[in-house]
C-alpha cells in the first residue's frame, strides 16, 4: 500500500507552541510575497523558447547535482542516471530506467534539504499524494512527464505560477545573450536578467582558459594578450551585459584573495599567464588582481559584485575527466577573508558607488571574519547561507553567527542559486519558514517586538534582495 506524501503546515516552525504561534503569524505575511531570484543558474533558453520540458528525469534529476552526488556516494554510476559526459555524449539509458534507479534510492535523501525541496515540488507543483519509492516510480514518471506536455507546465507558465518577479541567470563573457534578447523581444512580461561570470577568462588554471582568451579577443576586437587590451575587453563585455539588463557580476574563485599591483607589475604577471607559464602562486595572484580590477569597473558601471570563493572544484579527477564540471565533486575549504579582501577594501571598501556581496562555504568565518567586516565596511554585504549550508540548519547557523556583528541589514535576504527551476519556490519557502522561526524566537525572548519581526521578515524575503542587487 502506498504511503501518503504529506507536507505539514508547520514544517520547520518551532516545536514550542507559543513560539510556533508567533512564527505562524510571521510566515503568513511572507508566504505569498513575490520571489526575487537575484542569483542562479537556470537556462535562459527555457524562457526564450518556452518549449516543454522533456520528461521527469531530464527536468528533476539530470541537472541536480545535489541529488545525484548522494546517489553516487552510495555506488550508483552516473551513467545509470543519464548524466551527460564531458564531450556531450551519454550512456544509452532509458530516462524511465534512470528515474526508477533514482526512485529506488530516494530514501538516501531523508533529512536533507533536497528531500524537502523535492517533496514540495511533488506535492505542490505536481499534486502527487504518495511518496516516491521503487513502487511508485512509474506512477511518478508518467504523471510528471504527462504534465510537462501541457501548457500549464511550460517554462513561462511555471515562472508566472511561481510568482517570480525577477530571476537572474549566469553567463560567460563569451555568451551572445541571444536567449535574453529573444525574451526581451517576445513581449512576454517575465523579467529574466543575466549576470557577468568571467571565470573562464580570469582563471589561468581553468581548463578552457587559453581557448576562452582567444575567443574573448575575437569577440571584442581587443588585443587581449596585452594587459590594457584585456581590461578593455572586460569593460566592453560588461557594458554589453548591462545593456542586456544585468545588474551584477559573479566570481567563483578558489580563495577570496585580492591584490593591488601597479600597472607594470600587472603587465609582467599577465605576460607570464598568457604564455602558459604561471605557477600556482602566480595564477592565484592573477585571479586576485583581476578581482580588484573588477571592483574598479563596478565603481564605474554600477554592477553589483558577487564573490563565491572557497571551493575545491572537481575534487574527483576521474569523474571530472569523464563527466566534466558541476557533477557533485566540489568540496568546501577553509577560507580567509580578513587578509584576503584587504587590498580590495583598502581601495573601494568605503566607496558609496561600490557594492560587494560575499559568500562562504567556511562557516567558521561567519562570526570571526565576515560579520565583523560587513558590520563595518559600507561596501560589503553578506550573501546568505550557500550551497552546502542552505539546509535549514545552515540557515539558522548563519543567522545566529552573523546577527550580533552584522545585524539583518548587512545581509541580502535569500537567493536560491540553483539550476533546478522547479525547486525555486520550495527553496524560498524553506528560507521564509526558517527566518520566521528564527525571528519568532527573538520575539518570544523579548529581544524584538512582533511588529519589528514582521518588518524584518518581509525585508529578508523581498526588500533586501531587491535593494542589494539593484532590482
UniProtKB/Swiss-Prot annotation:
SUPFAM superfamilies: Metallo-dependent hydrolases. GO terms for molecular function: glucuronate isomerase activity. InterPro entries: Metal_Hydrolase (IPR032466), Uronate_isomerase (IPR003766). It comes from the Bacteria. It is an enzyme of class 5 (isomerase). One of its GO terms (biological process) is D-glucuronate catabolic process. Pfam families: UxaC (PF02614). It catalyses: D-glucuronate = D-fructuronate; aldehydo-D-galacturonate = keto-D-tagaturonate. Its EC number is 5.3.1.12. The keyword Isomerase applies. Keywords: Isomerase. Disulfide bonds: none annotated. Pathway: Carbohydrate metabolism; pentose and glucuronate interconversion. Belongs to the metallo-dependent hydrolases superfamily. Uronate isomerase family. This is Uronate isomerase. The gene is uxaC.
Amino acid at each position: 500500500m502506498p504511503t501518503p506524501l504529506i507536507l505539514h503546515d508547520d514544517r520547520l516552525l518551532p516545536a514550542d507552541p507559543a513560539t510556533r504561534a508567533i512564527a505562524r503569524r510571521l510566515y503568513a505575511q511572507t508566504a505569498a510575497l513575490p520571489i526575487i531570484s537575484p542569483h542562479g543558474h537556470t537556462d535562459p533558453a527555457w524562457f526564450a523558447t518556452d518549449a516543454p520540458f522533456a520528461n521527469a528525469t531530464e527536468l528533476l534529476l539530470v541537472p541536480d547535482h545535489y541529488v545525484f552526488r548522494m546517489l553516487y556516494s552510495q555506488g550508483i554510476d552516473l551513467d545509470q542516471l543519464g548524466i551527460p559526459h564531458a564531450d556531450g555524449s551519454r550512456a544509452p539509458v532509458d530516462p524511465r530506467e534512470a528515474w526508477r534507479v533514482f526512485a529506488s534510492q530516494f530514501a538516501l535523501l531523508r533529512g536533507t534539504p533536497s528531500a524537502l525541496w523535492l517533496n514540495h515540488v511533488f506535492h505542490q507543483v505536481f499534486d502527487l499524494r504518495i511518496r516516491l519509492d521503487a513502487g511508485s516510480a512509474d506512477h511518478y514518471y508518467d504523471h510528471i512527464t504527462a504534465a510537462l506536455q501541457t501548457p500549464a507546465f511550460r517554462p513561462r507558465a511555471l515562472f508566472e505560477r511561481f510568482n517570480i518577479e525577477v530571476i537572474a541567470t549566469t553567463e560567460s563573457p563569451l555568451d551572445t545573450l541571444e536567449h535574453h534578447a529573444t525574451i526581451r523581444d517576445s513581449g512576454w512580461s517575465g523579467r529574466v536578467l543575466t549576470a557577468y561570470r568571467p571565470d573562464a577568462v580570469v582563471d589561468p588554471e581553468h581548463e578552457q582558459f587559453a581557448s576562452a582568451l582567444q575567443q574573448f579577443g575575437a569577440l571584442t576586437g581587443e588585443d587581449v594578450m596585452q594587459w590594457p587590451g584585456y581590461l578593455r575587453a572586460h569593460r566592453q563585455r560588461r557594458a554589453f551585459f548591462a545593456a542586456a539588463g544585468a545588474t551584477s557580476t559573479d566570481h567563483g574563485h578558489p580563495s577570496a584573495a585580492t591584490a593591488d599591483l601597479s600597472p607594470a607589475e600587472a603587465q609582467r604577471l599577465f605576460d607570464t599567464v598568457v604564455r602558459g607559464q604561471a605557477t600556482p602562486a602566480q595564477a592565484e595572484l592573477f585571479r586576485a588582481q583581476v578581482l580588484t580590477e573588477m571592483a574598479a569597473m563596478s565603481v564605474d558601471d554600477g554592477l553589483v559584485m558577487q564573490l563565491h570563493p572557497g571551493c575545491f572544484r572537481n575534487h574527483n579527477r576521474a569523474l571530472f575527466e569523464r563527466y566534466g564540471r558541476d557533477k557533485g565533486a566540489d568540496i568546501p575549504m577553509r577560507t580567509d577573508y580578513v587578509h584576503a579582501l584587504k587590498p580590495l577594501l583598502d581601495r573601494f571598501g568605503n566607496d558609496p558607488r561600490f557594492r560587494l556581496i560575499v559568500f562562504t562555504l567556511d562557516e567558521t568565518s561567519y562570526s570571526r571574519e565576515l560579520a565583523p567586516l560587513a558590520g563595518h565596511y559600507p561596501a560589503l554585504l553578506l550573501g546568505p547561507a550557500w550551497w552546502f549550508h542552505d539546509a535549514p540548519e545552515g540557515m539558522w547557523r548563519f543567522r545566529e553567527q552573523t546577527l550580533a556583528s552584522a545585524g539583518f541589514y548587512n545581509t541580502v535576504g535569500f537567493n536560491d542559486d540553483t539550476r533546478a527551476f522547479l525547486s525555486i519556490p520550495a527553496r524560498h519557502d524553506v528560507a521564509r519558514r526558517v527566518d520566521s522561526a528564527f525571528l519568532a524566537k527573538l520575539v518570544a525572548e523579548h529581544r524584538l517586538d512582533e511588529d519589528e519581526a514582521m518588518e524584518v521578515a518581509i525585508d529578508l524575503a523581498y526588500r533586501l534582495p531587491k535593494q542589494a542587487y539593484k532590482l
